[in-house]
From Swiss-Prot:
PROSITE patterns: RIBOSOMAL_L13 (PS00783). It comes from the Bacteria. Gene3D superfamilies: Ribosomal protein L13 (3.90.1180.10). This protein is one of the early assembly proteins of the 50S ribosomal subunit, although it is not seen to bind rRNA by itself. It is important during the early stages of 50S assembly. Transmembrane segments: none annotated. Keywords: Ribonucleoprotein, Ribosomal protein. Part of the 50S ribosomal subunit. GO terms for biological process: negative regulation of translation; translation. It comes from Saccharophagus degradans (strain 2-40 / ATCC 43961 / DSM 17024). InterPro entries: Ribosomal_uL13, Ribosomal_uL13_bac-type, Ribosomal_uL13_CS, Ribosomal_uL13_sf. The gene is rplM. This is Large ribosomal subunit protein uL13. The keyword Nucleotide-binding does not apply. One of its GO terms (molecular function) is mRNA binding. Belongs to the universal ribosomal protein uL13 family.
Length: 142
């Protein structure tokens, strides 16, 4: 019996929707990364993108434990000398709530072209509205 290796053209991708209201950021991001990668499928192949599409709604209502709301910092650099910028979780959730989930999931995916392709299948929205009703996403409870 031979081991089955998935081919990119034979992969069947489903759409799932996750409501982030009251969910812990890290635990939810770990499950999202697991599903984007396709590790929950029996035909998982490390060098092929076998993951599903994930739509996350209510990103502004995600929570963190402890004092991370005030202490957790996100850093970016402008490219100019002395151009390092930092923003706390509290301020980032007010400014761009989808970026908190995107940053958490992106850090859990592989680096390189395959990881970037997996990340493109993640759709995050701050509110409860999303434009993916035509894909009929199934609700996923985490």
């Amino acid at each position: 019996m031979k081991t089955i290796s998935a081919k990119p053209e034979t992969v069947k991708r489903d759409w799932y929707i996750i409501d982030a209201d009251g969910k812990t950021l890290g635990r939810m991001a770990a499950e999202i990364a697991h599903r984007l990668r396709g590790k929950h499928k029996p035909e998982f192949t490390p060098h092929v993108d076998t993951g599903d599409y994930i739509v996350v709604i209510n990103a502004e209502k995600v929570r963190v434990t402890g004092r991370k709301a005030t202490d957790k910092m996100y850093y970016s650099h402008t490219g100019f000398i002395g151009g390092i910028k930092s923003i706390s979780f509290e301020k980032l959730i007010d400014k761009a709530p989808e970026r908190t989930i995107q940053n958490a999931v992106k850090g859990m995916l592989p680096r390189g072209p395959l990881g970037r392709a997996m990340f493109k299948k993640l759709k995050v929205y701050g509110g409860s509205e999303h434009p993916h009703t035509a894909q009929q996403p199934q609700e996923l409870n985490i």
